[in-house]
């Protein structure tokens, strides 16, 4: 067995040895008054673990069947990490940040996107993030639904497979000492019946989580002078953010009417970052965007591939027809999206599988380009998953007081959402109606999209924004695109269409995880949305509800993509960043690994795309297009 020792090498033995977290110590327990039976256990995190502000790490714990109006016949332990504002925690608003997936833990938000810290170059410690969102807001990161990230149902010793992200029972068939891609540790049960299985069920859980935390978590609730709550999310968060906040709004109305016991939540802002919101509005863009509708001159699929995908999308019984069939059956037999009707689940899962394979698959399987960045190889090293190795360190687990390993992504959650076909479904009325209802209730909605993302690309998202039928929709659609300035350079970093409380922003030179690519731009957009400013300049604060951007009806700014980044195989992000030959070498113990990076072997020739033809002209003309389907 060949294993090369290098300076500061992390070989295959250390990740295995780091598997079982230490038993948490010095936890504080709060008995919930908001929901009898629920508890909060937490501890203050030492400064330096992530940032230098006061922060608290802990769990909101629900015994079986204790949540209000939520299917939950199993224990739920939801992990949170709360960072106080750097200015005045008592008066600054609260922003909840959740990642998508489904099954993506929110620690990527902490260490890669909006949190107070970034990973150091050697991935062994952290450095301050100068663009942290807690400059003027309290930040709450939540791993949800249960069995995502640090959240768990029942602590279970198991083996995690980095190749597939699948948990398996401990035993001779899953022996980390014989396979370097396996990690023995403590996780949730891996039981797909013990988590939320649809967006709406996750919303039901989340409402209970926020009810308990906002009322009972004393470091936040005591002496609170500002009770505004905002929710920001990305990717699958295009469904989570509007779906959750619309459900909160519905529950608020029921509480006000005396139909439900609970606290009215002061809903302020919904932020959607590169979110997949509505398939009917967005799916076709997954054909157009890589063909000729991106602004970087990249033609990632050829004419034959384009024709094949378009046929699969539009033919009788094709992708669009199957989406519509799923919606019709779900509306009739499972309108409240409990995910318990087999016929609906089957039809919706089938539609999801067909559209993924026959439409998205033309690009995903053929272009060798990034799912999250069309300008990069599919073995995209950015942003790095090195924070996962940091969270596996015993001293970090002790500081956070976590009894479980961090699972990201959670195959269990991803699988059960796929079984119900949740991605194809929409909740009652759809997520477009969720956004409309929130806007009509005077909740701000900010849609923010990096323009190099494929999977939830800005072209489809623009269609979503123009398809939201709310009271002020005509004024939003009439608004033009304005340049977005976020520093003193005089160079615009984005373009925005905004009318009043609703904005759609396209951010240049950014992929799916926009905040990792353009952190300063992302922070400014967040700050301006949260504090009732115009997104373009941050200078308009008066009568913002009547403000409209002026400019061209289409966002046509184009530029060449930045140079590609060479693929980097990261042990902790093996499934997405490593080629087959590298994974095989890790599995056999024949890889050289330095600070979690596989330095040998390199990926096999042909893994990344060779230069492809570009198109001189692309999709927009000078006339307003009709985006409404």
Curated annotation (Swiss-Prot):
Identify the domain of life.
Answer: Eukaryota
* Predominant place of localization: secreted
One GO MF term attached to the UniProt entry: serine-type carboxypeptidase activity
Gene Ontology cellular-component terms listed: extracellular region; fungal-type vacuole
Q: Tell me the active site.
A: 235, 453
E.C. no: 3.4.16.5
Q: Keywords on this record?
A: Carboxypeptidase, Disulfide bond, Glycoprotein, Hydrolase, Protease, Secreted, Signal
Disulfide pairings? 326-355
InterPro entries under this entry?
Answer: AB_hydrolase_fold, Peptidase_S10
Signal peptide (from-to)? 1-18
Catalytic activity, per the record? Release of a C-terminal amino acid with broad specificity
Q: Which residues are glycosylated?
A: 157, 197, 405, 418, 463, 554
| Location of the protein in the cell | Secreted
Binding annotation for substrate: 456
**GO biological process terms on file:** proteolysis
PANTHER family for the chain? CARBOXYPEPTIDASE (PTHR11802:SF189), SERINE PROTEASE FAMILY S10 SERINE CARBOXYPEPTIDASE (PTHR11802)
Q: Which family does it belong to?
A: Belongs to the peptidase S10 family.
Q: What is this protein called?
A: Carboxypeptidase Y homolog ARB_06361
């Amino acid at each position: 067995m060949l294993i090369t020792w290098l300076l500061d090498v992390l070989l295959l033995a250390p990740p295995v040895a780091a598997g079982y977290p230490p038993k948490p110590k010095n936890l504080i327990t709060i008995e919930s008054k908001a929901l009898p039976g629920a508890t909060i256990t937490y501890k203050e995190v030492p400064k330096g673990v992530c940032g230098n502000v006061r922060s608290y790490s802990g769990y909101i714990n629900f015994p079986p069947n204790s949540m209000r109006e939520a299917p939950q016949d199993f224990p739920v332990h939801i992990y949170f990490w709360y960072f106080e504002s750097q200015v005045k925690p008592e008066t600054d608003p609260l922003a909840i940040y959740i990642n998508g997936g489904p099954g993506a833990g929110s620690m990527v938000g902490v260490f890669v996107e909006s949190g107070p810290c970034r990973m150091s170059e050697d991935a062994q410690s952290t450095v301050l993030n100068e663009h942290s969102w807690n400059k003027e807001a309290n930040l709450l990161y939540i791993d949800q639904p249960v069995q995502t990230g640090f959240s768990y149902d029942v602590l279970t010793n198991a083996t995690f497979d980095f190749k597939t992200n699948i948990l398996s029972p401990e035993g001779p068939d899953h022996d980390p000492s014989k396979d370097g891609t396996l990690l023995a540790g403590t996780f949730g049960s891996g039981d797909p019946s013990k988590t939320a299985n649809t967006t709406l069920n996750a919303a039901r859980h989340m409402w209970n989580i926020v009810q308990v935390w906002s009322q009972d978590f004393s470091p936040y609730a005591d002496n609170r002078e500002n009770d505004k709550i905002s929710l920001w999310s990305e990717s699958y968060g295009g469904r989570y953010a509007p779906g959750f906040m619309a459900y909160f709004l519905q529950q608020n109305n029921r509480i006000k009417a005396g139909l439900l016991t609970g606290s009215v939540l002061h809903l302020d802002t919904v932020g959607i970052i590169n979110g997949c919101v509505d398939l009917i509005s967005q799916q076709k863009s997954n054909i157009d965007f890589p063909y000729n509708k991106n602004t970087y001159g990249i033609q990632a699929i050829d004419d034959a591939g384009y024709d094949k995908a378009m046929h699969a999308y539009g033919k009788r019984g094709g992708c669009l027809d199957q989406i519509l069939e799923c919606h019709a059956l779900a509306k009739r037999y499972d309108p409240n999206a409990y995910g318990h009707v087999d016929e609906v689940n089957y039809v919706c899962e089938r539609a999801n599988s067909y559209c993924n394979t026959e439409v998205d698959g033309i690009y995903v399987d053929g272009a060798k380009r990034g799912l999250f960045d069309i300008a990069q190889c599919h073995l995209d090293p950015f942003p790095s998953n090195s924070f996962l190795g940091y969270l596996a360190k015993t001293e970090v687990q002790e500081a956070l007081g976590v009894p479980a390993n961090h699972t990201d992504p959670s195959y269990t959650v991803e699988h059960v959402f796929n079984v119900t076909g949740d991605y194809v479904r929409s909740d009652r009325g759809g997520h477009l109606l969720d956004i409309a209802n929130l806007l009509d209730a005077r909740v701000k909605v900010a849609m923010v999209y990096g323009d190099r993302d494929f999977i939830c690309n800005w072209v489809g998202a623009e269609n979503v924004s123009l398809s939201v039928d709310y009271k002020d929709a005509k004024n939003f659609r009439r608004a033009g695109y304005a340049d977005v300035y976020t520093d003193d350079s005089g160079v615009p970093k984005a373009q925005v269409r905004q009318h009043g409380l609703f904005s759609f922003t396209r951010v240049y030179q950014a992929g799916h995880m926009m905040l990792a690519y353009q952190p300063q731009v992302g922070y400014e957009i967040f700050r301006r949305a949260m504090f009732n400013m115009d997104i373009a300049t941050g200078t308009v604060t008066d009568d913002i509800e009547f403000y409209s951007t002026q400019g061209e009806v289409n966002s046509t700014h184009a530029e060449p993509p930045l140079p590609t980044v060479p693929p980097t195989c990261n042990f902790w992000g093996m499934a997405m960043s490593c080629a087959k030959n590298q994974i095989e070498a890790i599995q056999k113990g024949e890889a050289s690994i330095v600070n979690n990076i596989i330095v040998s072997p390199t990926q096999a020739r042909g893994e990344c795309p060779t230069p492809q033809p570009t198109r001189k002209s692309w999709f927009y003309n000078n006339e307003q297009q009709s985006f409404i389907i």
